[in-house]
């Protein structure tokens, strides 16, 4: 797994590229899909996004690529600054990296990362997608945040543990092959 700062940054980049696409489309289709289609009467979520001229974000319609880019920048910054370092520290408080089987330790890191990143990114999403046309109310923001955490946490936990992280670890191992050292 990552051994230096460059490799950690690349690992975070690979993770965020896959994760952001998964969560943006999960959010659009599963969390907000029925509401979006009810607004315009479109028969599909993509048809609705086309009819509206984008996705409502920060009080205006933004093209889907803008949504992915904004969430990518937020997620990468959070992952590098908070997610990876804090999740490793949290996992190290429970398990000793030297004495624990690598699969168990990596699972602990994934669980800690989801536990930190899901509420943080859900809060950012609550701010980004807040219905500003109704005015701003802190209680509404907090309620939207809690709703997003409840929707996103199970999806985040299972996709990270069983799909995204195994995929990223396999890609990372292929990209950064280690030459076995002989003694």
Predicted regions and their residues:
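Juxtamembrane/disordered regions of integral membrane proteins
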Residues: 1-183
């Amino acid at each position: 797994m990552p051994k230096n700062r460059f490799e950690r940054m690349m690992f975070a980049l690979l993770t965020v590229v896959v994760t952001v696409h998964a969560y943006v489309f999960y959010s659009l289709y599963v969390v907000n899909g029925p509401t979006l289609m009810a607004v315009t009467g479109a028969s599909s979520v993509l048809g609705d996004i086309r009819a509206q001229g984008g996705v409502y974000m920060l009080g205006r319609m933004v093209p889907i690529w803008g949504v992915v880019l904004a969430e990518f920048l937020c997620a990468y910054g959070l992952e590098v600054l908070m997610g990876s370092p804090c999740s490793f520290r949290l996992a190290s408080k429970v398990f000793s990296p030297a004495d624990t089987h690598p699969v168990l330790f990596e699972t602990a890191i994934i669980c800690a990362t989801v536990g930190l990143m899901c509420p943080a990114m859900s809060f950012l999403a609550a701010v980004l997608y807040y219905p500003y046309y109704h005015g701003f109310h802190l209680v509404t923001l907090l309620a939207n945040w809690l709703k997003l955490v409840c929707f996103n946490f199970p999806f985040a936990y299972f996709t990270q543990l069983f799909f995204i992280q195994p995929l990223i670890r396999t890609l990372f191992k292929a990209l950064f092959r280690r030459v076995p050292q002989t003694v």
